[in-house]
Structures are given as C-alpha cells and as structure tokens.
Amino acid sequence: LNLDEIVAEMKAAHAVGQDVARVHSGDPSIYGATAEQMRRLDVLGIPYDVTPGVPAFAAAAAALATELTLPDVSQSIIVTRTAMRSSAMPAGEDLTTLGKSGATLAIHLSVNNLKNVVDELTPLYGADCPVVVAYRVSWPDQAFVQGTLADIRDKVKAAGFTRTALILVGRVLGGAEFTDSRLYAADHTHVLRPAK
C-alpha cells in the first residue's frame, strides 16, 4: 500500500470504532517513515500511540554478543544510510563526512550500495577495519557475515544478501583491546554508588 492507501485504511477503521495496529519492523523512530503517517493522523484528529521497537543495530549487537561502544576505541554510534533510489542525504551527511569521526557506523538500507560504502570508508577507516553485515537480524533466519572493508563485498556476495541487511563498521567489531570503563571502577562514585 502507498501512504494514501495506508491512511485511508486507518481512517476507515477509526470511523467504525476499530483499533488499528500499524506494525513496523525495527524501531519506528528510525527509517520507519512513521512521521508522515502521524502527521496525517494528526490532521484527521485520529489519536495514536507509538510503541518503541528494537533498532536493528541494537539487535545485531546483542546477537553478536558485542558492545558498539568501547573505551578508547569508539564512544559514538552514527546511524545512517546511503542514498540510492530513496530520499537524498542532506548536505554533510555523506559517508565521507561522517566517517571522519572514526565512530562506529550503523548503515541501514545500503547493502546494494556496498561498493560505494567500502570505497568511501576505506581511506578513513583502513582496509583492515572490521565490518559485519547483519541479514534479517532478530528474525529466525538471521545471518551474519564478518569481514573487513577489504573483503566484505566478496563475502556478502557469496552469502547472497541483497536486502534487509544492516552494515556495521568500526574497530569495536574486531575484538579491539580496550580499557575497562570508569563506570564500575572501585574509586568511581556516583549517586547510586556513593563513596564508602
């Protein structure tokens, strides 16, 4: 259904007193195209609730038993996508600009643009930078391909991933050495753990 058809279905159901559950995959706040639906429901005066979901990058990290932020490695995660047939990326949100940060990248909707992802990030992260491509993460048939910027394209091609995949890029994915967080250090106090 297109947007007009989706809204028409919700409007018709609301008119006869039915409750509607508009289910999205992942978290509706990230690439869910829910804002445009909510805007139309607001105009129509139809009330709604938004229930948070689990973002694909968080589900992938859990399935991989990894943390996407590690002390002295990366303390930031950038959630982004690349432009192909969808809406253009705003100025300054291209991979070359975002990659200059060195942050862990969670790149959605871009597995068919993997060549450009690799080409843009290799000069910034290095060919040996770890990459994970997560296919249908959190579904029973989820699968992962692990590699580096140098070899991930061949591995993804061999796996046959052509859609519904998330690309994670960053040193945190490679078992990097890191120092323990200060959060649980014996000499670190805070409101929930005052000094002894």
Regions of interest found by a model, annotated:
Residues L1, P52-G53, S110:
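Short beta->alpha connector loops at strand-helix junctions that form conserved
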Residues L1-A13:
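A cross-family phosphate/adenosyl-ligand binding-site feature
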Residues E5, A15-A21, A33, R39, ...:
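A contiguous loop/helix-start segment that scaffolds small-molecule binding in enzyme catalytic cores
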Residues A12-M84:
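Short glycine-cluster motifs
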